[in-house]
């Protein structure tokens, strides 16, 4: 098992992860995957919905997509203060395509990128419907997104 981890680390060092953020549906290239919560189709639905601003973060190694995460910045308008709140919502922890890569490390890279992209626009970042609550624990702790 240790050899596999070392091999994964070496692969990541040889081939750096490139992260791309897509904000317009017509700019998104064809991507693999079957998870509806991180699909291009849901991106288009959010894009056409008033008050929703979707962004799709795709991780590439070379020109090959290895993971993706769909987030949406949702604007809530209320009668009482604070009247307008923007929050970033993500369903699940993304979708990953390369079994050779450590998914939690890849998620950590995507989470770092997501945080830098949305914190200036939204009040909070909320992850919902986590399939495995322990997945990404290290990345969430590192970003201080929750504490004991």
Where are these regions (language model features)?
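N-acyltransferase acceptor-side catalytic subdomain
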Residues: 1-148
């Amino acid at each position: 098992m240790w050899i596999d981890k070392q091999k994964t680390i070496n692969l990541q060092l040889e081939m750096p992860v490139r992260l791309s953020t897509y904000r317009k549906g017509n700019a998104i290239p064809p991507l693999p995957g079957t998870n509806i919560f991180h699909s291009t189709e849901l991106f288009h639905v959010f894009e056409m919905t008033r008050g929703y601003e979707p962004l799709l973060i795709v991780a590439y190694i070379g020109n090959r997509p290895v993971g993706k995460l769909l987030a949406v910045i949702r604007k809530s308008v209320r009668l009482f203060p604070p009247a307008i709140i923007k929050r970033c919502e993500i369903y699940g922890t993304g979708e990953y395509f390369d079994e050779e890569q450590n998914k939690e490390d890849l998620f950590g890279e995507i989470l770092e990128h997501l945080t830098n992209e949305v914190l200036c626009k939204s009040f909070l970042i909320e992850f919902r419907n986590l399939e495995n609550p322990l997945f990404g624990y290290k990345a969430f702790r590192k970003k201080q997104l929750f504490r004991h």
